[in-house]
From Swiss-Prot:
Protein function: Required for maturation of 30S ribosomal subunits.
Keyword annotations: Cytoplasm, Ribosome biogenesis
Gene3D superfamilies registered for this protein in UniProt: RimP-like superfamily, N-terminal
InterPro entries: Ribosome_maturation_RimP, RimP_C, RimP_C_sf, RimP_N, RimP_N_sf
Localization, UniProt: Cytoplasm
Full protein name: Ribosome maturation factor RimP
HAMAP family tied to this protein: RimP
Alphabetized SUPFAM superfamilies for the sequence: YhbC-like, C-terminal domain, YhbC-like, N-terminal domain
Primary localization class, coarse: cytoplasm
Organism field: Polynucleobacter necessarius subsp. necessarius (strain STIR1)
GO biological process, one term: translation
GO cellular component: cytosol
Keyword Cytoplasm belongs to the record: yes
Amino acid sequence: MKEQQVISAELENLGYSLVEIEREAGGLLRVTIENPDYERLITVLDCEKVSHQLSYTLPVENIPYERLEISSPGLDRPVKSAADFQRFAGMEVDLKLRVAAGNRKNFRGELQGLLSGELNSPDAKFGLVFEGADGQSSQLEFSLAEVDKTRLVPVIDFKGRKS
């Protein structure tokens, strides 16, 4: 928990927000960042600035790592917080539940956002409209505690430039 607090505070000081922290084999610490206004994309210069700052801060705070990687969320960004689930309402996502609902854990569908409860309360319920096995549209209602992971489905336009 200290790790997340330290990194999040440093990112806020630099004008960024934390999306995700991952630890991988070989001592890799991967930090995913975004701009709080969501308007400006993360560039290599942003990643360099954060990497430089964290490479000084982490040793001072006794947070171990061998390699530090800073990145943007990408097209298939993770959807983690209640605010993310509300922000990306109407978009297509891949959602994996911790425990199966109706004999399945994995769903792809349109995120509905907050259905009931307060946004940041543990009893907040979100929705997902997906195509069932019978081809009919179904709605899944879930809380954040039931979600293992969720990612946006990338939308890529290959039309290119018109001459």
